[in-house]
Amino acid sequence: PQADDPIALLDRMDAAAVRAAAAAAPSVRVPLEALGLPADLGAAHVAGGTNFRAHGDEVGVDEPFLFPKRVAPTRWESTVPAATRLDYEAELCFVALRPIRGSEGAGDLGVVLCNDFTDRWLLVRGMLLGPGVMGTRGFADAKGRPGFLPMGPFLVVPDDLERWLQSVELELWVNGALRQRAPASDMIWAVREMLARALADREAYRYAGADVPLLQERGVLPARALLLSGTPAGVIFRAPN
């Protein structure tokens, strides 16, 4: 990691020391376009599907599920590659600040705004429907193309993540039109439950022609890996009537 990487900084200093250093430092103005990725991050992540009830209703899926998101994040203003049926999904990316082995590790997560882009045509052709299999086929390929994980420039590390999330609202706008809006509190699986399910997962997921685990080391969410929250209603795709 770079010397100014915030995750490396938090590994060396506690939150109080970081706040004290920030308060003592002079203010600096930085143009928005100069801001890049907020930290050095990995390329093997865990994502939640239909974790907002209204989004599950609009796509015809009843329960949340998990799947691997095997792609490196890109800058917030990066061009997204063209796809047959490209779709957006505004999400919260929970960032592991250190290796996490239990749901109590939810306190070791930061948060970044991200977009879980999808090739819906590739997804629909490859997915399996039904309890226990949702997410195991189609999702990793349809959401794992290079450039399909643009990320905001700000890493937020709350003192109390779960309390902080009660005040967060997700919005996505397209060409001046509001498409998605929901409070983070609408998540069906809260972050602690998502984390527990990911750490306990033993399923095989199809990606790039091979079976892969949800986590590269089962039972461990490694430092710099992401846990994606799922998205609110308002995506382009709709289930047929």
Task: For the regions a language model picked out, list residue spans one by one.
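Short catalytic-site patches enriched in acidic/histidine residues
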Residues: 54, 65-82, 95, 144-159, ...
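Hydrophobic alpha-helical segments and helix pairs
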Residues: 64-119
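Fold-independent oxyanion-binding glycine-rich loops
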Residues: 48-51, 69-71, 90-91, 96-99, ...
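Short, basic and Ser/Thr-rich N-terminal targeting/leader segments
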Residues: 39-41, 46, 61, 87-90, ...
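A generic local secondary-structure boundary/capping motif
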Residues: 35-37, 56, 79-86, 92, ...
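N-terminal non-catalytic cap/leader segment that marks the start of a structured domain
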Residues: 1-65, 70-71, 77, 171
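Catalytic-pocket segment enriched in acidic/His residues
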Residues: 16-20, 26-28, 123-241
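Short helix/loop capping segments that flank catalytic or ligand/cofactor-binding pockets
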Residues: 55-57, 76-77, 102-105, 121-123, ...
